UniProtKB/Swiss-Prot annotation:
The lineage of its organism: Archaea, Methanobacteriati, Methanobacteriota, Archaeoglobi, Archaeoglobales. NADP(+) binds at residues 52, 56, 87-90, 134, 156-159. Coiled coil: none annotated. Catalyzes an early step in riboflavin biosynthesis, the NADPH-dependent reduction of the ribose side chain of 2,5-diamino-6-ribosylamino-4(3H)-pyrimidinone 5'-phosphate, yielding 2,5-diamino-6-ribitylamino-4(3H)-pyrimidinone 5'-phosphate. This is 2,5-diamino-6-ribosylamino-4(3H)-pyrimidinone 5'-phosphate reductase. It comes from Archaeoglobus fulgidus (strain ATCC 49558 / DSM 4304 / JCM 9628 / NBRC 100126 / VC-16). GO terms for molecular function: 5-amino-6-(5-phosphoribosylamino)uracil reductase activity; NADP binding. PANTHER family: 2,5-DIAMINO-6-RIBOSYLAMINO-4(3H)-PYRIMIDINONE 5'-PHOSPHATE REDUCTASE, DIHYDROFOLATE REDUCTASE FAMILY PROTEIN (AFU_ORTHOLOGUE AFUA_8G06820).
Amino acid sequence: MRPYVFVNVAASLDGKISDESRKQLRISCEEDLRIVDRLRAESDAIMVGIGTVLADDPRLTVKSAELREKRQKDGKEPNPLRVVVDSRCRVPLTARILNDEARTLVAVSRIAPEEKVREVKKVAEVAVFGEERVELSALLEFLHRKGVRRLMVEGGGTLISSLISQNLVDEIRIYYGPIFIGGRDSPTVCDGESFLKKCRIEKIERIGEGFAVTARFNR
């Protein structure tokens, strides 16, 4: 058993999620950011790859105090569990995703340096999945056992590609902002090895100056 896996990502009209520097770019409009905050609040956990942590240093928390209060009234913690897919345990000890605003799980493989793992364990939960790379299916089963029923994935492109190619995504929502980024080395929504995966378009909606496409995959 695994959670319902929902991917949310913002991209340029040419499908890029950042430029060649891989630093965070503002693509979403204010209205879309409010929608993303609501989607976070409705999730049991939020997952990103280590590349996103190193590039953006995200908090991955619910920004709206009203939404955090609603979660608490529903018997939940103010913020969802944060999950980092980090085979080699490269997460900086100063990363904001390790702060005390929410619980954090760092998923590593057996090649992660033991000393670094011990340090990270002082501020977060660390669990091993796989020999050299994190086995995503095992991680999702682990999260389901922890009570995670809805998992929101926010990137980056390598993690999203791995999940979709392994049939581990149920739904994806892509917000397209009115910009072009270009660059053959700029990261895309799905990075990594090529694959073919069909989906069905559920909804296309205008949001601010951009639009969002929601699609589902057969489970």
